[in-house]
Design a protein with these regions (language model features):
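Conserved helix-turn-beta segment immediately C-terminal to the redox Cys motif
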Residues: 59, 75-99, 120, 173
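Short, internal strand/loop/helix patches
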Residues: 113-151
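Thiol-/selenol-based redox modules, centered on thioredoxin-like
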Residues: 151-196
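Conserved redox-active cysteine motifs that mediate thiol-disulfide chemistry
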Residues: 65-82, 107
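A short beta-strand-turn-helix
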Residues: 40-61, 84
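Short pre-active-site segment immediately N-terminal to redox-active cysteine/selenocysteine motifs
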Residues: 59-61, 66-69, 148
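Thiol-based oxidoreductase modules, predominantly thioredoxin-like and allied folds used
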Residues: 91-109, 124-134
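N-proximal helix/coil linker or "cap" segments that precede and/or mark the start of modular domains
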Residues: 22-40, 117, 193-196
Length: 196
């Protein structure tokens, strides 16, 4: 049996530490995305692939990239689902939860099945999206960096990024909810439809 020295284990311990810290970093107030505009992204609705990709202008959006394979993502998702349920009747808000595979382009059928199975097993009522060819992540990475799961962008009604959360911390749900509610003040309430 080989004797493993501490010096030989340093690179492994360093990598494990980086991965662990990525999973618990929380809101990033200096993220390069803050203040930048997010254009349309080539996303596919898992429930209806013919549905148009979400538009960000005019709404407050939480754009979340997560994966069923990612433990911090699985811990964060129930909080996002609770927030989306709480604001379900407010047309000024949308949660765009993008389910991502473990690496490379995602097979749409596989990601749809895996995501549906996960959401059902967790009893999460969530409208999930996919980035099957990885283009949305490529666009975001080229524009202002993307590299950890989960990553959540808070996008204002002017389609600019207002906050970014990378990784997961238990208080993120409350922080995200407060940020969303505050940002909703920038979007006029829509009048209910008139009776005919």
């Amino acid at each position: 049996m080989a004797n493993l020295s501490f010096d030989r284990l340093k690179p492994v311990l360093h990598a494990v530490t980086i991965i662990a810290l990525a999973g618990c970093s929380g809101v990033d107030t200096n993220h390069p995305a803050i203040g930048r505009t997010v254009g349309n992204l080539p996303l596919v609705a898992l429930a209806d692939p013919e549905r148009p990709a979400p538009a960000f202008a005019g709404k407050v959006t939480l754009l979340n990239f997560w994966g069923t394979w990612c433990p911090p993502c699985r811990r964060e998702l129930p909080g996002l689902a609770r927030l989306a349920a709480r604001l379900a009747d407010d047309a000024r808000f949308q949660l765009v939860a993008v389910s991502c595979g473990g690496g490379g382009p995602d097979d749409l059928a596989e990601i749809t099945a895996t995501t549906a199975e996960f959401l059902e097993s967790q009893r999460l009522a969530l409208d999930a999206w996919a980035d099957p060819d990885g283009m949305a992540r490529t666009i975001l990475a080229a524009s202002f960096g993307f590299g950890a799961y989960p990553t959540t962008y808070l996008i204002g009604p002017d389609a600019t990024v207002r906050a970014v959360w990378t990784g997961y911390r238990s208080r993120d749900e409350a922080d995200m909810a407060a940020a969303v509610v505050s940002l909703l003040k920038e979007v006029p309430a829509r009048a209910p439809p008139a009776d005919r």
